[in-house]
């Protein structure tokens, strides 16, 4: 089964542009996941949209950084990038660490989603309880739990965060505490029903 692990970096939190996206396509069989494709690009804010200073503090994606990393033969804006849609056409299963946020920016509906943060809250029992509940695990908490090496200087880059999320997902594939959630996620669906924007 094909699964896509992805992450976005955006120009704010709501009603804003995608500045960077990274997606890794996997072939998942049992407890094994093999990388079979990758998509990674940078984009500019939509016309008339100013750079969000608070977002820059998190992701560091200034206009200069985007100019440096952007290829001139690629679409300027994420909404114009049909190649990303094509990259995603053969799967209906998506993984992200905060998928409720990231999926808002995709140009199609996700049918099957797996949130490593949400599942992690149920299985990792991260310390520092709030309101008698375990806290949501950050990407770094989940990485530490599954013994994934980290470089904190690279956090909040779509490419690096996707790679870390991928390794966490691989760990979860083998985790008996996640088996029930994983089985539900990996059920077969009809790809033709995916609501892609063309």
Task: Report the location of each language-model feature.
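Acidic, Mg2+-coordinating catalytic module of metal-dependent nucleases/exonucleases
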Residues: 93-100, 104-105, 138-198
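Ser/Thr-centric signal marking residues that sit
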Residues: 8-11, 116, 165
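Short aromatic-enriched loop/helix-cap "lid" or pocket-rim segments at secondary-structure transitions
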Residues: 51-54, 125-126, 193-194
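Conserved non-catalytic scaffold segment of RNase H-like nuclease domains
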Residues: 2-110, 133-146, 152
């Amino acid at each position: 089964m094909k699964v896509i692990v992805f992450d976005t970096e955006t120009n704010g939190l709501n009603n804003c542009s995608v500045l960077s996206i990274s997606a890794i396509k996997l072939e998942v069989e049992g407890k094994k996941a093999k990388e079979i494709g990758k998509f990674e690009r940078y984009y500019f804010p939509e016309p008339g949209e100013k750079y969000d200073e608070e977002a820059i503090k998190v992701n560091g994606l200034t206009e200069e950084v985007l100019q440096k990393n952007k290829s001139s033969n690629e679409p300027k804006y994420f909404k114009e990038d049909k190649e990303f849609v094509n990259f995603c056409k053969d799967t209906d299963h998506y993984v992200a660490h905060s998928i409720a946020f990231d999926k808002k920016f995709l140009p199609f509906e996700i049918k099957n989603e797996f949130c490593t943060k949400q599942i992690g809250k149920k299985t990792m029992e991260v310390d520092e309880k709030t309101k008698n509940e375990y806290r949501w695990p950050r990407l770094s908490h989940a990485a530490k739990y599954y013994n994934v090496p980290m470089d904190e200087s690279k956090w909040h880059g779509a490419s690096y965060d996707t790679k870390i999320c991928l390794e966490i997902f691989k760990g979860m594939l083998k985790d008996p505490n996640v088996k029930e959630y994983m089985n539900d996620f990996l059920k077969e669906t009809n790809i033709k029903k995916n609501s892609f924007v063309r």
